[in-house]
Every structure is written in C-alpha cells, then in structure tokens.
C-alpha cells in the first residue's frame, strides 16, 4: 500500500470536488508547511499565505464538524522538534493567542466587545484596562531559572514539547544568567528571540563576503526572523555566538514562590503590567512601547501609532498584542480551544505575499539606467495592490533567479518600492528560461552598456532616447551648458508630455502658436522663450559638449576636449588612444565619449542641431606636448594599499603611459600590490622593474615636475 509523505514539499493547491477532499488537501499542505517552518526552518511561503490556508480549514471544519479529524493542524499549535535536540516538556504549555484577522481599527473594537461580553459588562461600566504590546516577528522562547540561575532554554515546539537550546541562548547578552535574590525560586520567563534589522544586514554582508571568497555551503538569509531561528537552532554554540541575537520578555510560564510570597489573598503581582515591571527589575528587556490602554479607543490609537512607527523600529513586528491587565480577570475569562480569551494579536496588513511573475519588463529611467521589473499577478501587500516589483539590476535578478511564470514572495514595507524577496523554485514551470538583460535599449534601440565596476546597464542614446528626453532637454538648457533662459522643469514636462518636443532639435522648431497653446503660457512668455532659444544658438564648443550630456564629461573635461582638439568633428572621430592623450581623460571617460559618438542616433541629433543654426567659434588643435610617461608601458597587479587598479590606470594614462594586461619584454614597469601572483613572477624572470604604489606616486610626481 502506497504511503504519502506528509512533510514533502506541497503541491500547488487545487479546488477538489468535495469539502472532504478540500479539507484533506489543506491538512496535507499545512502539515508540510508547518514541518518546513518549525522543524527545518526553511519556510517556502510567507506567514500570510499560511494564515490564509489555516483560516480556510478552520472555516470548513466549522461548517462540517463531522469531518474534523484529530490530526488537523487546527488542533495543535505547531510542529514537532528535531531529534538532534533534547526534548523539553513545558510545565505550563506555550500556547498561541488568537489572531484578529481584521487589520483595521474595528479589529480592536471586536476584541473589546468580546471581553466586555465575557465579563458581563454593560455600557455603564468603565472601560476595561488592557496592556498593549508589540507583536515581535521572531522565535518564541521559554527561559527557566531555578534559584536565580538560568538552567534551561526551550523553544515553543508544538506548545507542549519544545527543544532545549540552552547553550545557544546563553550567548545572547541581553538575557541574564543570574537573577537578583528577590526573584522567585522557580521562574519561567517567556519572550521572543529576534534579530535587529541593522544586525541582520551586517550578518548578510558577512555572508556575501564569504560567498564571494568561494566558501562552500554559505547563503544569505531571507529575513531577520529566519536568521534568528537558524541561529537558535545551531548545533554548534560557537556558530550561534557569532549571530547577533536579541531578546524581549513578555510573560511567564511556571512560577514557584517562596512560602511567604504564596498568599492567595495578596498575590505577588496583580496585573500583567506589574509582572512586566518585575521582569524588567530582574534584568530582562521589555519593549519600551508597552503601555496601559483603557477601552477600545486607546487600543485603536496604539494600533495606529505603532503602525506609523513600524518601518522606523529597529526590529520587525507584524502586529500588536492586547491583554486584559488584571490577572484575576484573566483567570476568570480562561481559555477556549487552547487560546486565552483575554488576549488577541491584532496584525497589520502583511508585508509579504505570494504571487506569480507574469513577465519581466526592462524600464529605462530619466538618466538612461535600465531596471528589470517583474510584472506580477495583482496581490494585496503592505496595504496596497501591487502589480510591479523591482529586480534592481541584472546581478540581483540572476542571484534570485527570477523567471517568467515563477511563484515568488513579494515584499512591500511602508513607502518602499515593492521587491521580489525570493522564488519558490519547486513551483517553477518546466523549461522556464533564465532572464538576461537586453543589450539594446528597449525604448530607442541604442546600445545598452555596463561599465566596469558598475551594476547597471545604461542606454547610450541619451540625445535620442524617449525615456531620457526630459532629462536631456533640461541638461542641454542648463545655464552652464547652452543656457536657454526660461526653459525650466514644468515647461519641459508640458512640452514633452504634449509631444511638441521629441528631440533637442525640436526646440528650435517651436513657434509662437504652439507655445501659446500651452497652459499658463502667455504670449509675452512665449516670445521671451523664443528669444532665449534664438540667443542660445550662439554658444561655445565646451558649453555645447557639456550640454550633450555625455556620461563622465563634466564642464572641466569639456573644456579640455575643446582645447585639445579645437573642433567638434575631431572629437567625434577621435580614437580611444587619441582621447587618452587629453589631459585628465582616463580610460573610463575615453570609452564613454567613444561609445556616445558611436551611436548613429546621437550623431544625427548633433547634425540636426547644427542645421538648426547652433554654432560656435572653432579653433586650431592645441599643440600636443609630449607627456612625461609617453612611450612607457605599465602592468598593474595585486591589491594596492590606497588606489584601485582603475584609479592607478587612470593616473598612468593621464601622464601619457600605457597600461597593459600582461607582462612582456616590452613592459617597462610592473606595479605590484599584495597577492600579485604570476605577473610578478614573470616580471622577475624577465628582469623588469617592479615598483609598489608609493614608488609609482613618486614616479608620477617627478614626471610632472619635469
């Protein structure tokens, strides 16, 4: 007889023919997800998706109670512990609290109404006093102290039995190892182990460094919660100690008092807030945001205030928790279905959700940057419906390996642009192709290039590309460029949006009728702009060059190019080597100039501008004096103390030297840093001069002095 692995990766849900089949499918899927979440610490869906499936099963069981089975996930808190850790049976079960699915203000109102009804209160009775707390997104923990000494730390597990992780928890410096003498002889403190956002980012930075260095088996963490859970359940405490964990206390489990303290008529604490204050006095961290709230109105105010602060907190929360403050009233209200009637978790809209990638579109920004964007099946996340999520750049898209048709986790926090967090590769369609960035701009067809050391591809058709049109016009009209007085942001927006201007030459084709038809453009203003356009036709070569918006060509470089070559045609036709002969022009700038003028679209726009009457006085090329390192060939190898290889290369080339990629008999100098390798060995074999960075700087300085 075939058996089904309940903990196998679940298949995508489908709608069965009957409630019994649907309930069986949901139980299997929830068991599998609970196993991956609680046991393996490898969740594949966001919490919100698990909650949705769980709620669907609860609703079906309420509608068909005869189909309820003892093995249903609704009849227990969580999953089983791993065999590698010793099992711990909780003296007082670590039960979960009810989640209020209504994320609006009415969620708090609903809870208060239930409490007042349970306590038999009417409108004439005063508001119920609550404690409002944060709901941390971490790992629940029970800390057992005997005679003031930490003797055991255990995870929640299934609520009845957890795992002992004492050695790992001892590494968290916020958790006291010994309590003051006034603490009870036996005290179980309940709280949350979590990781601060800054610590999480620092940890992932270290992971990325390890991966870049070739370390095997290393990976980055999806979120702080996963990182914290993985650290707590490390078998090696030394590894756990390297993970920056934190802790907040929010309650107690078993408490055994001294004989003189155990007075039913005069309890050691009468309220939940008194309990938290006692924990704080014994050295446990308690969240500063915890406060007393009277009635539904103050619960609503707390929920709204924390929602506004949520993204600025140094740690993740996914909601707030309300608890009846009086311990006597808590006892009176009791539990239902293993959940306390006197507490509720009031969540915020989920910041992560599952959805499907319908396509990947490459968008072009105002400055020519190409950004891959995932087009998504609409999903409600972070309080809004999301249909697009940035993939940032080619490296990031490939690292996450996002493909069309993939099921992905998308995240949106606050006003942050939605992004794809991770992919569920087991749900990938067969044959889905990998994403690759286009080598031509999707808007204008010009070459898209990625410069060395940069993450982004950029369109090289700056003068022609529709996506860059507004930015190109504004830059051209800048007072330090060609200068067109009166042509500002708002007017450019109007002209481009109305399709009056498509390229720069269209500026000089504007007439009074077209301008006067624009909103808030009086005839006088239109005439003034036309005069400014006519005036701008007479400019200088440096201003015109700067106005073209060539990447890396600022005002100073434009002046040097004009001085060196004397005329625009010579600059447009200059080779890489000829450009490198210009003062302060290195390989990156030279390549950028060459790439710009290699695009036929850009040359066409330049010729059209000249045909419209834009002109300047051209001169003779400057006499080219030999540079101090002309004729010298350098090879740079290893890591230099202060300069990157590109910086060292630029300095050598600016002084007239040539930088080669390999050592030969024609090499004059090898500039060697640490870990120089085979190039240094070959230089020594050939008897070529080997210098360090300091010697290179002295050589450059002496060459300049000559």
From Swiss-Prot:
Catalysed reactions listed for this entry: NAD(+) + (deoxyribonucleotide)n-3'-hydroxyl + 5'-phospho-(deoxyribonucleotide)m = (deoxyribonucleotide)n+m + AMP + beta-nicotinamide D-nucleotide
Molecular-function GO terms, alphabetical: DNA binding; DNA ligase (NAD+) activity; metal ion binding
Residue numbers annotated as active site: 135
Domain spans labelled BRCT: 624-706
Broad enzyme group: ligase
Residues that hold Zn(2+) according to the record: 441, 444, 459, 465
Cofactor(s) needed for function: Mg(2+); Mn(2+)
Pfam family for this entry, one: DNA_ligase_ZBD
PROSITE patterns given in the database record: BRCT, DNA_LIGASE_N1, DNA_LIGASE_N2
Binding site for NAD(+): 47-51, 96-97, 133, 156, 192, 323, 347
Family the UniProt entry places it in: Belongs to the NAD-dependent DNA ligase family. LigA subfamily.
Role summary: DNA ligase that catalyzes the formation of phosphodiester linkages between 5'-phosphoryl and 3'-hydroxyl groups in double-stranded DNA using NAD as a coenzyme and as the energy source for the reaction. It is essential for DNA replication and repair of damaged DNA.
NCBIfam families: dnlj, PRK07956.1
PANTHER family xrefs: CHROMOSOME TRANSMISSION FIDELITY FACTOR 18, REPLICATION FACTOR C SUBUNIT 1
Protein name: DNA ligase
Organism: Polaromonas sp. (strain JS666 / ATCC BAA-500)
């Amino acid at each position: 007889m075939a058996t089904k692995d309940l903990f196998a990766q679940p298949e995508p849900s489908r709608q069965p023919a009957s409630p019994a089949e649907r309930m069986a499918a949901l139980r299997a899927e929830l068991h599998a997800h609970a196993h991956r979440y609680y046991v393996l610490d490898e969740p594949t869906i966001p919490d919100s998706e698990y909650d949705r499936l769980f709620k669907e099963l609860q609703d079906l069981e309420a509608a068909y109670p005869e189909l309820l089975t003892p093995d249903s996930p609704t009849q227990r808190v969580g999953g089983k512990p791993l065999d590698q850790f010793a099992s711990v049976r909780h003296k007082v079960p670590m039960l979960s609290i009810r989640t209020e699915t209504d994320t609006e203000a009415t969620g708090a109102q609903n809870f208060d109404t239930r409490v007042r009804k349970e306590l038999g209160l009417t409108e004439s009775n005063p508001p119920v006093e609550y404690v409002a707390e944060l709901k941390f997104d971490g790992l629940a923990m029970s800390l057992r102290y005997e005679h003031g000494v930490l003797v055991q730390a255990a995870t929640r597990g299934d609520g009845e039995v957890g795992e002992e992780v004492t050695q790992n928890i001892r590494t968290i410096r916020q958790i006291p190892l010994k309590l003051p003498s006034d603490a009870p002889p036996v005290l179980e403190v309940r709280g949350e182990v979590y990781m601060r956002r800054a610590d999480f980012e620092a940890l992932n930075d270290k992971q990325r460094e390890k991966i870049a260095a070739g370390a095997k088996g290393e990976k980055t963490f999806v979120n702080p919660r996963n990182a914290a859970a993985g650290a707590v359940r490390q078998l090696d405490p030394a590894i756990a100690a390297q993970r920056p964990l934190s802790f907040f206390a929010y309650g107690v489990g078993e408490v055994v008092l001294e004989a003189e303290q155990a007075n039913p008529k005069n309890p050691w604490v009468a309220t939940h807030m008194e309990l938290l204050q006692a924990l704080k006095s014994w050295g446990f961290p308690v969240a500063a945001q915890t406060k007393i709230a009277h009635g539904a109105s103050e619960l609503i105010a707390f929920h709204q205030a924390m929602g506004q602060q949520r993204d600025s907190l140094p740690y993740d929360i996914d909601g707030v928790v309300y608890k009846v403050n009086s311990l006597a009233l808590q006892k009176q209200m009791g539990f239902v279905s293993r959940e306390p009637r006197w507490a509720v978790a009031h969540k915020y809209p989920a910041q992560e959700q599952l959805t499907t990638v319908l396509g990947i579109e490459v968008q072009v920004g105002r400055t020519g940057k190409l950004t891959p964007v995932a087009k998504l099946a609409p999903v409600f996340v972070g309080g809004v419906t999301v249909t697009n999520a940035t993939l940032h750049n080619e490296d990031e898209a490939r690292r996450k390996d996002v493909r069309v048709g993939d099921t992905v986790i998308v995240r949106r926090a606050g006003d942050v642009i939605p992004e794809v967090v991770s992919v569920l590769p087991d749900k990938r369609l067969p044959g889905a192709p990998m994403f690759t960035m286009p080598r031509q701009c999707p808007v204008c067809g010009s070459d898209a290039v990625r410069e060395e050391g940069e993450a982004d591809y950029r369109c090289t058709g700056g003068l022609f590309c529709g996506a860059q049109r507004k930015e190109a016009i504004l830059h051209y009209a800048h007072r330090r460029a060609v200068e067109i007085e009166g042509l500002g942001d708002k007017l450019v927006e109007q002209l481009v949006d109305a399709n009056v201007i498509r390229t720069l030459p269209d500026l000089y084709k504007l007439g009074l009728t077209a301008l006067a038809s624009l909103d808030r453009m009086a005839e006088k203003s239109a005439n003034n702009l036309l005069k400014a356009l006519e005036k701008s036709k007479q400019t200088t070569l440096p201003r015109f060059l700067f106005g073209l918006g060539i990447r890396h060509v600022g005002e100073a470089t434009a002046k040097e190019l004009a001085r060196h070559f004397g005329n625009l045609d010579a600059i447009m036709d200059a080779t890489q080597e000829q450009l490198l002969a210009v003062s302060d022009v290195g390989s990156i700038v030279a390549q950028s100039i060459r790439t710009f003028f290699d695009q036929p679209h850009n040359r066409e726009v330049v010729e059209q501008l000249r045909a419209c009457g834009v002109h300047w006085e051209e001169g003779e090329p400057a006499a080219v004096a030999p540079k101090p390192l002309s004729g010298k060939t350098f090879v740079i190898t290893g890591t230099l103390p202060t300069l990157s290889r590109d910086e060292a290369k630029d300095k050598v080339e600016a002084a007239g030297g040539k930088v080669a990629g390999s050592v030969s008999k024609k090499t004059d100098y090898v500039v060697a840093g640490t870990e120089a390798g085979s190039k240094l060995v070959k230089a020594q074999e050939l008897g070529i001069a080997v210098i360090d960075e300091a010697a290179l700087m002295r050589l450059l300085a002496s060459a300049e002095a000559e």
